[in-house]
């Protein structure tokens, strides 16, 4: 299939323009989390994307969803509502980290990179864990219940940077505290709500493109059960399981 071909070519040529060194031992991938916010206030659903800084070593100038590396302290942040049980169960498969950590990372990174708040207003008596001071100062609490786990992807071996990324989707109207516009920052610029068709025309990492396809499937067939894909690569090519 076209997708198989695309994912296999990713393995041979690194997207960030860095030469793939075959002989070196592979780094263990670092846990990461990404949030795809979906708005449905127009005829076509739109997703929030931004352009990575050109100075980034990893995927410069590519359009991506907000997200980043899991900080172990993220799991300690307080939540208004926890993940739904079925979402939590899927995140536990072949994973040692507490599921809420991924959701909290996705929410923290979205806040840091776009200024948008997936949460509720509530005064918290306790001190915030590192990385959550600003949330705490604004009397905000993350809300995990709107997040749906839609996929997981591990960067191919022999890369200078490797991630084991969990992708979440959330309905903007339910998840966001208000309708403020996203604000460009150091990590992401040209932040915009784009239709899936327009998003596909942007310069995207192939895993981002793959997950946009998953979003399209979920939005087109809301009543069906959608099992999150788990993409990973080996020397013989890539494998896609469904969790």
Predicted regions and their residues:
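N-terminal leader/linker segments that precede catalytic domains of diphosphate-processing enzymes
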Residues: 2-243
